[in-house]
Amino acid sequence: MAFEGLADRLQQTISKIRGKGKVSEQDVKEMMREVRLALLEADVNFKVVKDFVKKVSERAVGQDVMKSLTPGQQVIKVVQEELTELMGGEESKIAVAKRPPTVIMMVGLQGAGKTTTSGKLANLLRKKHNRKPMLVAADIYRPAAIKQLETLGKQLDMPVFSLGDQVSPVEIAKQAIEKAKEEHYDYVILDTAGRLHIDHELMDELTNVKEIANPEEIFLVVDSMTGQDAVNVAKSFNEQLGLTGVVLTKLDGDTRGGAALSIRAVTNTPIKFAGLGEKLDALEPFHPERMASRILGMGDVLTLIEKAQASVDEDKAKELEQKMRTMSFTLDDFLEQLGQVRNMGPLDELLQMMPGAGKMKGLKNIQVDEKQLNHVEAIIKSMTVLEKEQPDIINASRRKRIAKGSGTSVQEVNRLLKQFDEMKKMMKQMTNMSKGKKKGFKLPFM
């Protein structure tokens, strides 16, 4: 989970004050001392921590909080609001050119994930916003950079504009934008060159590309796990180019959160997107308020619902609901439902979006074995149509055949059939409970 270490510390700290009917200045002072230590250990910029603690302390000991009926809850609300403000307040959306194409310039150091992020962004613009993006290979220095972008283009079935590595990035950008205008592309995403460190040559070239491309957005791609190094890189790029946004990669593996909590305050540049995995759909808009809620253990129901709406086919969900009511739910239906849930993302991450997940020890430490889910899929796919519709006919010899065909063991086949039988019994109970009610039970997110 992103920011797991910081979240644990902050949740432990605020739990001490949550249920208090009366909160003194000393209580606030002690809480903020622990908050300060937690933020510093998370590699948050020292000045940012100092300002944050000051703002929360001043608001937390104010009359509105101290005289409220639930002062403990009010203090936590103040912490959440200031944490949200620290990360940018509201979601910052992509600017759109008055006349297409909208040009987005991707910049950053080598190794931050700039090329992959360019592909992810193009994929997001096409899938979620129904736009037509063009990827442009403007990194002519890194070996295989052009090849990498072309490979991503093939995976996404998306055009990649390239003039090879013997043409200047300025000329590449110029010709790419002309082609995008001719062929009516909505977005041009320039994957520019990076370096192992910031130098004048790199900045001069990027400045020249900026002048010719006139981009609506200049996104800096940084590795969130590098903490204050990411903040320093953002500061340097912002001074030279005037960044419009930051994309934090590897946020799913960042247990501390120093970069995310410092970048906006230090550079006044919003975090636009967060990379949450290696898959090409693992890029999400950065929502400061939702992230603050997750850090404080309040869950992120809105993101969970959005993921469900994007992954679950509404017509199929209604059909599935009807099958559950009539007890005609088969192993094929179960397999389809499992696939839709897996499309929403790693199951352990989805569980962490539930409010109060941090306080439930069993849920917090749960490790979902994706390999086990692969085994379940393989077992069901190794069954005949009749076996999937009537699992009761699966005798010992059939179980051996299914295990052999799926590369699993008979014990795993037995376990799946037992779990499916128990699930059907539970559905029957739910159906009986809903009798007499007009609507009956509904699937989640319906």
Swiss-Prot record:
Family annotation (InterPro entries): AAA+_ATPase, P-loop_NTPase, Signal_recog_part_SRP54_M_sf, Signal_recog_particl_SRP54_hlx, Signal_recog_particle_SRP54_M, SRP, SRP54, SRP54_GTPase_dom
HAMAP family according to UniProt: SRP54 (MF_00306)
Family under the similarity heading: Belongs to the GTP-binding SRP family. SRP54 subfamily.
Protein name stated in the entry: Signal recognition particle protein
Record PROSITE patterns: SRP54
Coiled coil: none
Enzyme class: hydrolase
SMART domains to which the protein is assigned, alphabetical: AAA, SRP54, SRP54_N
Recorded GO MF terms: 7S RNA binding; ATP hydrolysis activity; GTP binding; GTPase activity
Keyword RNA-binding attributed: yes
Any Gene Ontology CC annotation: signal recognition particle
